Amino acid sequence: MEARLVLGSSSERRKAVLESFRIPFICVSPDFDERSIVYSGDPFKYTKELAWNKANVVRSQGFSDALIITADTVVVYKGEVFNKPESEEHAVEMLRTLSGSSHSVITTLVLMQNEKVLSASENTQVSFIDIPPQHLKTYVRSFSSLKRCGGYCVQDGGGLIIKQIEGCVYNIQGLPIKTLNQLLMEFNISLWDYLV
C-alpha cells in the first residue's frame, strides 16, 4: 500500500509540476522561517538544510507516517545566493546583476518517511540575455518576481530574458522531476505509473 504523499511547499509552481502527473498528493505549507538558516558558502549544504527543516516541520504538523517531499531552490551567481527578492526594487537589482551572464539554479529535494530520509540536488545553468534596462520594472511586475528566487520565472512569458538553459528546466521551477522520480523509486513509487 502506498503512503500518503505530502508536498511540503507553498510554491504554486512546484504544485503545478506535480499535478502534471495523476499521483494523489496533498500540499502543506511548512511553517518554517527560512531566514533562520544562515548561508555559509555552500549552496548544496544550504538548500539541503532548508529542505530537511521544511520536511521535519511538515512531519510535526500531523504527517508523521506520510511520504513527505520538500525542496529548496536558490540562484547562485559568483558565490552569492539569490533567494526571493524582498521588494520590487530588490528584484530589479537582482535581474540587473544577472543580466547578460550565466548563473546556477540549485534545488535540493528531501524525501522523508518515518526514519527513512533521502536527498538529492540538481544544478542547472541559466544564461540571460542583456536585459534592456527599461524593461526590468515591467518584467518584475508582470511575472510575480517577489515569489521567485532570483526574481524570475522560466514559464509563460518569463522566459523572454533567458538565452540558454543547460540542464533540467523543471529545476528552475523548483521541482526537478527526473531527480524526484529517482528518489521516489527508493520508496517504491514511480512517476511513470502516473502519467496523464
From Swiss-Prot:
Residue numbers annotated as active site: D72
Entry-linked CDD domains: Maf
GO biological process: nucleotide metabolic process
Pfam families hit by this protein: Maf (PF02545)
GO molecular function: dTTP diphosphatase activity; UTP diphosphatase activity
Location within or outside the cell: Cytoplasm
Reactions catalysed: dTTP + H2O = dTMP + diphosphate + H(+); UTP + H2O = UMP + diphosphate + H(+)
Site, Important for substrate specificity: residue positions: R13, T73, Q155
The protein's required cofactors: a divalent metal cation
Entry keyword set: Cytoplasm, Hydrolase, Nucleotide metabolism
GO cellular component: cytoplasm
Its EC number(s): 3.6.1.9
NCBIfam families registered for this protein in UniProt: maf
HAMAP family found in the cross-reference section: Maf
Primary role: Nucleoside triphosphate pyrophosphatase that hydrolyzes dTTP and UTP. May have a dual role in cell division arrest and in preventing the incorporation of modified nucleotides into cellular nucleic acids.
Family: Belongs to the Maf family. YhdE subfamily.
Protein name: dTTP/UTP pyrophosphatase
Species assigned in the record: Chlamydia trachomatis serovar L2 (strain ATCC VR-902B / DSM 19102 / 434/Bu)
